[in-house]
Amino acid sequence: MYARCGRPSIAPEKLLRAQLLQMLYSVRSERLLMEEIDYSMLYRWFVGLYLDEEVWDATSFTKNRDRLLEADVAKKFLKCVVERARNAGLTSEEHFTVDGTLLEAWASLKSFQPKNQKAKTPPDDSGNPTVDFHGKRRSNDTHISSSDPDAKLARKGPGKEAKLSYSGNLLVENRNGLIVNAELLEANGRAERDAALLMLEQVPGTKRVTAGVLTRDTIRLNSLRSVVISELHRTWPETKARRGGSAIDARTVHHPGYLLSQRRRKRIEECFGWLKDTAMLRKLKHRELFRVG
């Protein structure tokens, strides 16, 4: 009645533990991860495999990824970790830092083609076609990536190289530098501001929340909506002051708590550095916002 060649079922928590190992120890692929779990007693113990138990096939991650995404397991996993830290008194519910970074999409600039482009002749090289886009004006309004339609052409600042990217945003509490929330949005120029408001809405408690925001765009947002943010989100902006005028009054700038907050803001950059270098998220391994996020 049942096939004899089928694979045994895998508990979702074991898949999550294995993927956590992949990020913590910078394992570049899931196939290599299975090889290392096979001969590492430490990895087997952490994942929950006996010494004589066979490891899974690397395609098990691919086949189960959609199920994990549909149930939003990664978000729930982070929420449980944050809740345990909060119960242990390791997090603050008052002082936070919000910032965003660009994560390079798994798509090349050659795939960034005009939206209304008509069918062309076959390329000279199907594996790596020649595309001459120098001197041509390209924007997200007129072009779209054929490899990853959700990726947007963006750059972090003036003079920086523009790449197909997503906007990764973090909410970090300042007391211990723990990540308490994360949002991935399209890099559309408003992502950091939208993500900041979205994550601050989810901060528990009734106390007033202070949020240090690092970007110039969000500073302009705070100058226009500081009253709205304070009333609706129990949030008071502690943005970095600018020369030639700032949205922050002098009383806030000279307060000892503000100076301490400015020194703690660097911790969110350390989180971004770990995610990009150790967890290997500098260049994403999946496509489409639903899968990447």
Regions found by a protein language model. Name each.
Residues 1-20, 25:
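Basic, short loop/linker segments at the boundary and entry of helix-turn-helix/winged-helix-like folds
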Residues 6-10, 41, 212-221, 240-242:
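Acidic, metal-coordinating catalytic cores used for nucleic-acid/nucleotide bond scission
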Residues 28-35:
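Short, solvent-exposed positions on alpha-helices
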Residues 35-38, 49-227, 233, 293:
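Polybasic low-complexity intrinsically disordered regions
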Residues 6, 65-69, 262:
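Short alpha-helix plus adjacent loop in nuclease-associated cores
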Residues 44-62, 242-259:
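Phosphate-backbone recognition surface of nucleic-acid-processing proteins
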Residues 117-121, 130-134, 138, 216-293:
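Helix-centered, glycine/charged polyanion-binding patches within enzymatic domains
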Residues 5-13, 161, 263, 287-293:
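Structural motif
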